[in-house]
Amino acid sequence: MGDVNYFLTFGAGFLSFISPCCLPLYPAFLSYITGVSMDDVKTEKLLLQKRSLFHTLCFLLGFSVIFIALGYGTSFIGSLFRDYHDAIRQIGALLIILFGFITLGVFRPEAMMKERRIHFKHKPSGFLGSVLIGMAFAAGWTPCTGPILAAVITLAGTNPGSAVPYMMLYVLGFAVPFLLLSFFITKLKWIRKNQLFIMKAGGVLMIVIGVLLFFNWMSLIIILLSDLFGGFTGF
């Protein structure tokens, strides 16, 4: 079951990356943290330079610090409720289903959809500045990714001791495409065009996973796959 959860957590990071309220901001945001203008990106492709790559990595480092720290807290809380694993699993499953419906846009609770960001009037200087902006971006997060992140945290809470790996994979799911985008920033049209479908598919997947988790069918599926593939699930 853990292998599937790791795969899904990585996918949740990717879904957060392509959320409609974040995706359109990335070209300008990359220009901001790297100091490269959009005209430079289109004409000279300066994002291939080491300076730009280092700034992007520093941003992702700051981003990662927040979520890995959150994972440590989630792991601690989860260990306190180890004796109530089944109840936590079912409550977590219901929350994941709820977040799936929110992602689909079935309803929009105002408290969850409020946006809280830290804004910089001027970019802090140097690579440390990019780290700080990454931390601010993670701490401020945005409404459309809130339900996805909350689902990951809930899933982590049902698996004491696995919260930090979950959060690391969530960060990787966001970081890998972000790094790729820094090299292929002019190739964003396809994702923009299909972002609504991708988010809807993600919402449906969250609901399905929530149902499987609630009835503990995920474990049965893993056992079945193990029987079919000789002990290797393929995930």
From Swiss-Prot:
Name the Pfam families on file.
DsbD_TM
Q: What keyword terms does UniProt attach to this protein?
A: Cell membrane, Cytochrome c-type biogenesis, Membrane, Sporulation, Transmembrane, Transmembrane helix
Gene Ontology cellular component list: plasma membrane
Which positions, given as ranges, span the membrane? 10-30, 57-77, 87-107, 133-153, 165-185, 204-224
Q: How does it sit in the membrane?
A: Multi-pass membrane protein
Report whether Cell wall biogenesis/degradation shows up as a keyword of the record.
Answer: no
Biological process (GO) annotations?
Answer: cytochrome complex assembly; sporulation resulting in formation of a cellular spore
Ion transport in keyword set: no
Query: Where does the UniProt annotation locate this protein?
Result: Cell membrane
Q: What superkingdom does the record give?
A: Bacteria
Family, per entry: Belongs to the DsbD family.
Function, in words:
Required for cytochrome c synthesis and stage V of sporulation. Might transfer reducing equivalents across the cytoplasmic membrane, promoting efficient disulfide bond isomerization of proteins localized on the outer surface of the membrane or in the spore coat. Cytochrome c oxidase activity is partially restored by mutations in bdbC or bdbD that are defective in the synthesis of disulfide bond containing proteins. The same mutations abrogate the need for CcdA in sporulation.
The protein, known as: Cytochrome c-type biogenesis protein CcdA
Organism of derivation: Bacillus subtilis (strain 168)
